[in-house]
Amino acid sequence: MISRVMIAGGTGRLGTLVVNGLAARGVDVRVMTRDPKRAAHLAGERIEVVLGDVRDPVSTMKSAVGVQAVVSAVHGFAGPGGVSPATVDRDGNTHLIKAAQEAGAELVLMSIVGAAPDSPFELFRMKYAAETSVAASTVSATVVRSTAFVELWIDLLVNTAGRSNRPLVFGRGQNPINFVSVHDVAALVERVTLDQTTRGQTLEIGGPENLTFDELARMVIALRGGSDGPRHVPRAALQAMGPTIGRLLPTLGRQAQAALAMDQSDMTFSAGVNDIRARFPDLPCTSPEETLRNFHAANGRADRV
């Protein structure tokens, strides 16, 4: 029985939901964060915040002592100096795997649908490297792969819309992409953390729709009372960013390269025979439309989605 869990990445969009969900179930949750101020929104008698960084094997090992499960909800796609997919998603997860092994704990690793050694996305390659490290270890683990969090991209579209109410789309915006609600993913991660029968398995979760960025942007525009189409950053501009601005600002360079890949790679999702919601029928299946309505309700007015 899992009664004490350590979560790395517990202050983020996904991690916060998992922390609160597990604590509500009566699980003692230890949140490892490199900045305790970022955990100020996490409060409760079952929630403990400790200082640690997945890039540092010593603090990671210390944070895992005494727990029965370690959950990795980290990602290094964007962040301050030294944060990258290589240092966080590959090396950091390797440290978490070793910490779980040393503590005699089980592991839940958050990964990405499409993770592969030859992926055009650096993040996907590093997630695959972490999965490989799990497979080579003796840790009893569950890997959860998800598609793109729709809340993340809605945030980006809303924040770039400005007074014109025309969100900024990187590239053509015509490539179908599967979007999933982070709430759906959190519900699965919470479940498998406690369900030890899922150990040794890789589970995939996606959303109910494949949408282009143009389609998602137009949904945001419509909810905010507009009718025009989104603005676009041409592919040529994105291609130029990598060898120029990207050298000075690596995060921006990664974002440009990711945008190019998302504009042409197959990012659709079909559950098929491994439909996670057939296995767990009570898992939520939130549509992008419902997520947008929730944003509207949370902010009070459509112009503050």
Question: Residues of each region from the PLM?
Answer:
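Non-catalytic, hydrophobic alpha-helical segments
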Residues: 14, 70, 185, 189, ...
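Glycine-rich Rossmann NAD(P)(H)-binding loop
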Residues: 170-175, 203-210, 222-225, 232-235, ...
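NAD(P)H-binding glycine-rich loop region in Rossmannoid oxidoreductase-like domains
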Residues: 31-103, 114-116
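A hydrophobic C-terminal alpha-helical subdomain
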Residues: 235-305
